Amino acid sequence: MSSPVDSIRDKLIDALKVSDERHREQRADRIIWMSTYRSRPGVIVGRPETLAMLDEAEDAFREGHFISVQLLALAFVEHTIVEELVGRSLSKERVNFERAIELAQSNQVLDTKLLSRIDRLREIRNPFAHRRPHDDPDTYGNRYISRQIHPRAMLEQDAREAFQVMYLVFSALLKAA
């Protein structure tokens, strides 16, 4: 005789099968898209937290968790830039992201256009990470209303941009072991 938990579990598995089938093609398309940006050497050495964010951002993108992609990709970028600044004795360990971008700019750590993209993504990410006033033009609601775009489409565009930038930073600051 099955328990109530087993019955619920069976129903959940059936529902998940339907959901998996419904989203499979979109996941496949996202995996193909990611493969054009994702390039890694055989072995990567780095801080476990930083590398875990890289992996988690990929998982989140594949599954369509676009806000998570933005948060994880930008956290990865922040960690990587700060680590580079510290390694070059240009900064202390604790520097905020905006200041790290400024230091990277003034010390030519990364390409100016890439740093501009990073800073814009930081502005887009901030309302998810830090409470903002209702009239802040970078809040999620204000952005999709002003752009006259479906919220989910905008989130996916932002996630794609964050993912691209994450891998551009990864490639630019990758060091040979």
Where are these regions (language model features)?
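Flexible secondary-structure boundary motifs
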Residues: 71, 75-115, 135
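Charged alpha-helical initiation segments
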Residues: 1-65
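Amphipathic alpha-helical interface segments
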Residues: 37-91, 159-168, 172-177
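Surface-exposed polar/charged interaction patches
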Residues: 18-22, 107, 172, 176
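Charge-enriched, short contiguous segments at helix-coil
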Residues: 112-177
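Short, structured secondary-structure boundary patches
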Residues: 16, 31-35, 89-94, 134-136
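A short, mixed-charge helix-start or loop-turn motif at secondary-structure junctions
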Residues: 38-40, 107, 148
